[in-house]
């Protein structure tokens, strides 16, 4: 009897030793793979061994994507770029202990369609967190791109919430903006040099008014956010395949969305200009001097009442559209006017 008990404990010790050795081998394999590049590109064998098979004392952040041009996934490449920023930041800024707790990987549909079938996935991109104790049949935690966005900061917050490992996101320098600014300044200086004998346009109030309005609309629409984050022009709903020009999250936006918001602000401004011009025309008692006003609205010779009504319609309609855009991005937004 004692021999049987002793043999049982010996076998148990050998099993635990082999299991521990297997775990150490898996972690070391991942460390070796991520020492050459920040992410692990999974095939079926690596997927079964490193992600789905126990034992595992580390977390895997895996993006399922389709980067092949034939798949026609417009947001896969931007989402992959943001994912790589987080993975590279984790590789170069996290401590050695944190780098052994969290690993980043990618499954491309072209390279491993069997993994997509195993996970019952027919859309991309999708980001999953496979925790240390997640079983082979349990569903991993998924990041909600529609609500949270897929920029690097949002992915970093998802990683921190799931793993308690905080990744300091560091973006690579973007030299596009400085080059564009330098070219614009050079063009402006060249124009000033060519017109050095006639600089009257610098004192034209209409020109400066248009310049100020253009700058205001650009910044109010969120165009600078686009230059910093580089979002896609639009996205396609993976379920309905319908294009979406406004992202349904306050943490992300699309390029088309900034154009829409900027246009709405411009139309609202035109409405206020019409109302203001109508008030000036109605209050002006000197018709001779009023006829000398050199602005487009006075030159069109539009009746005062028509101008005022057109301005009010522009303000009411397009301001209502603007509020509806805000409500579509934030469901708890309390204000609306003509449209829900």
From Swiss-Prot:
Pfam families: OST3_OST6 (PF04756). It comes from the Eukaryota. Keywords: Disulfide bond, Endoplasmic reticulum, Membrane, Signal, Transmembrane, Transmembrane helix. The keyword Oxidoreductase does not apply. Residues 33-164 form the Thioredoxin domain. InterPro entries: OligosaccharylTrfase_OST3/OST6 (IPR021149), Thioredoxin-like_sf (IPR036249). The chain crosses the membrane at residues 174-194, 206-226, 255-275, 306-326. It is a multi-pass membrane protein. It is found in: Endoplasmic reticulum membrane. Its main location: endoplasmic reticulum. Disulfide bonds join 73-76. One of its GO terms (biological process) is protein N-linked glycosylation. Residues 1-20 form the signal peptide. Subunit of the oligosaccharyl transferase (OST) complex that catalyzes the initial transfer of a defined glycan (Glc(3)Man(9)GlcNAc(2) in eukaryotes) from the lipid carrier dolichol-pyrophosphate to an asparagine residue within an Asn-X-Ser/Thr consensus motif in nascent polypeptide chains, the first step in protein N-glycosylation. N-glycosylation occurs cotranslationally and the complex associates with the Sec61 complex at the channel-forming translocon complex that mediates protein translocation across the endoplasmic reticulum (ER). All subunits are required for a maximal enzyme activity. Belongs to the OST3/OST6 family. Component of the oligosaccharyltransferase (OST) complex. This is Probable dolichyl-diphosphooligosaccharide--protein glycosyltransferase subunit 3.
């Amino acid at each position: 009897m004692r021999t049987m008990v002793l043999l049982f404990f010996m076998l148990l010790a050998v099993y635990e030793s082999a299991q521990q050795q297997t775990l150490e081998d898996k972690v070391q394999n991942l460390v070796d793979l991520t020492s050459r590049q920040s992410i692990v590109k999974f095939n079926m064998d690596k997927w079964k061994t490193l992600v789905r098979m126990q034992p595992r004392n580390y977390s895997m952040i895996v993006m399922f994507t389709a980067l092949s041009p034939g798949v026609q996934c417009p947001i896969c490449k931007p989402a992959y770029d943001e994912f790589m920023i987080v993975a590279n930041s984790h590789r170069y800024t996290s401590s050695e202990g944190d780098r052994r707790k969290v690993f980043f990987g990618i499954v491309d549909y072209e390279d491993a369609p069997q993994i997509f079938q195993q996970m019952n996935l027919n859309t991309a991109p999708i980001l999953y967190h496979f925790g240390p104790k997640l079983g082979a049949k349990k569903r991993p935690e998924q990041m909600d791109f529609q609500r949270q966005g897929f920029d690097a900061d949002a992915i970093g917050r998802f990683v921190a919430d799931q793993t308690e490992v905080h990744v300091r996101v560091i973006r690579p320098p973007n030299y596009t903006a400085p080059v564009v600014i330098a070219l614009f300044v050079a063009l402006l200086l060249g124009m000033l040099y060519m017109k050095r004998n006639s600089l009257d346009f610098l004192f034209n109030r209409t020109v400066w008014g248009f310049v100020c309005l253009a700058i205001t609309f650009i910044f109010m629409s969120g165009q600078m956010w686009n230059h910093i984050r580089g979002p896609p022009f639009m996205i396609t709903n993976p379920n309905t395949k319908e294009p979406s020009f406004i992202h349904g999250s306050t943490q992300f936006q699309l390029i088309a969305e900034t154009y829409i918001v900027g246009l709405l602000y411009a139309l609202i401004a035109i409405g206020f200009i019409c109302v203001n011009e109508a008030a000036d025309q109605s209050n002006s008692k000197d018709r001779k001097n009023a006829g000398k006003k050199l602005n487009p609205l006075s030159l069109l010779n539009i009746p005062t009442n028509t101008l005022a009504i057109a301005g009010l319609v522009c303000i009411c309609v397009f301001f209502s559209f603007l509020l509806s855009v805000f409500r579509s991005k934030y469901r708890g937004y309390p204000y609306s006017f003509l449209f829900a």
